[in-house]
Amino acid sequence: MKFLLAAINAKYIHSNPGVYSLRAFARTKIPGADIEIGEYTINHQMDLILQDIYRRKPDFIGFSCYIWNISYIMEIVRDVKKVLPEAEIWLGGPEVSYDAKKVLTREPDVRGIMRGEGELTFTELVRAYLQREKTSVPDRYTGESFRGQAKEKTSCCAENTRMPEAGEGENAHSDRLELSHIPGITYRTESGEIEEYGPQRLLSLDEIPFYYDDMAGFENRIVYYESSRGCPFSCSYCLSSIDKTVRFRSLDLVLPELQFFLDHKVPQVKFVDRTFNCKREHTLGIWRYLVEHDNGITNFHFEVSADIFDEEELELIGKMRPGLIQLEIGVQSTNPDTIREIHRHMDLVKLKRAVDRVYDYRNTHQHLDLIAGLPYENYESFMRSFDDVYRMRPDQLQMGFLKVLKGSYMEEQVAAYDLKYRGIPPYEVLSTKWLPYSDVIRLKGVEDMVEVYYNSGQFPATMKLLEKRFQRPSEIFVNLAEYYEKNGLTGISHSRLARYEILYRFLEEDMREEERDHVTAAKVPETGGAKEWTAEKMENAETGQPSLADFRDSLMYDLYVRENIKSRPSFASDQSPYKKEVREFFMAEEENPKWLTDYAGFDSRQMAKMAHLEHMEDGTFVLFDYKKRDPLSGNAGAVRFVYKDGEETWQMK
């Protein structure tokens, strides 16, 4: 009998650790069981997935269900049942665990649901199906009996076929599918009734085998790893709050398994632990090992609560290779009333102190999260939270929108919060008592601008100037979102270069409006017209505001610090007057390398193509060296020079 565990991932680079864990555990308990894994993505053509499943000819198909793939999976299930009518289809995962009876009532093609953790439940299901197979039901695809034993064909799954009762006939107990002894399942009986049994016992994580015995198939993909399950916290929007039991895998197992990844030079290992640092000894044991055995390549991703870091943990982070680890830190809100209402325990002062400390090391990528749509948080309150988190200088600021997950405490408070949300996955907030849908739309626009202009990491110099121009960080993205909407730019896939052009036009228009305000407010002399203002010269001693020329320089810097671009934007200044200086610089580097020390064997013309020297409107030159890149951001090395005309010397500025 063939079992297929099917995972529909969001992207190709993702993998599904759940199905691998189920297979690994079942194989240790039932050696020889024929269990395959089929991994697909929601970007696959559904027809191709259907074809692949059909060619495998599984007798049992288990689908791993989440909010982002459940609709896709149910479409596949309905078609699979048409082409493989005898296949038993089971579902598992958080999206079906909390209303399993409703799912079965709604989806007649599904035989059953594995609720909660699935390793033990799936193994017992495999054993039950194999026990039924011992009666040698003929293979539904070839007509040949399983294991070569000729037996009379029976239809164990037909809804109208009467199954023998206990005690009827020889082997009566083995020729029917006996599921009543399996905890953690909700299933449809042969008569069509839906039955549900109590929860499955929780395994020790040490009982679950390491499922990455072979790295073939994981090339260029994120590898997921689990060193703990559960969460000690009770955040109302999260399913982890339901079970506060936290279990840890012994370090005696964890450390050799991490060495396996290091030996295979896996690019990234993402820990799926809900709060990785909730147990100090566990955290330090793993991090010390990674520091001592660093291969210089592998990056490890952790979800942490930064406010519970102690001095020893922070000092250890400071000793790490740049890029060895990255941290995802859930802040969600800085509104005290909101934090209290969602049952979140967080010391914002300690959190900020820890984030600032790690930032100062400049060796660890930090990803900070916010959630819009939480109780007691209106538009202005969320913007204050946004500004607070932005000022912590995260490498990425992730704006999420509340998902009302089945089984969560948040779902119970829908009426109290006047919470409206999408009726289909991912059940995202539409409005609350504090946040109307009109403000949700505004925040969606802000989210888009944050992704493009901040999280992309492609505008670092320009963002610093924008922070000077606007009073609050949030104003940058609010104004950009309004500009996109006003000019019909929203919802369009723009090229990288186009994003720079749009930002420049936005600044140009914004400064013109400010220019008009200045002119209107200026006192006009009786003998002449209004004073002529130009955006080029907007910087002045009174405001210290950057000029349009400053932004032009910063945008060119941001473009070249990422890559040696071939196409220049329309706002780029003419570089032809500086050909002589550029040529002389590279000739000097060829003769006596001072700055381009990694270009031995290349002549000045080749260097000029491999590196780039840009004249800026402030009179300086910036050298971009693409052989020297920042290990954290990936940006090219950049040095600013002043050219001393006549002396033909370059001085770093």
Predicted features, each with a name:
Residues 57, 280, 292-295, 299-308, ...:
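A structural motif corresponding to the C-terminal lobe/cap of the Radical SAM core domain
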Residues 1-20:
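A short, flexible N-terminal coil/short beta segment enriched in small residues
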Residues 206-360:
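Radical SAM [4Fe-4S] cluster-binding motif and immediate context
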Residues 2-8, 46, 59, 156-159, ...:
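Radical SAM enzyme core and accessory elements
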Residues 1-2, 182-224, 637-640, 646-650:
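N-terminal [4Fe-4S]-dependent radical SAM core
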Residues 3, 35, 89, 182-183, ...:
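Hydrophobic/aromatic residues located in beta-strands of well-ordered beta-sheets
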Residues 2, 25, 29, 34-147, ...:
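Glycine-rich beta-alpha loop elements in corrinoid/cobalamin-binding modules
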Residues 26, 61, 185, 231, ...:
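Conserved, mostly hydrophobic/aromatic
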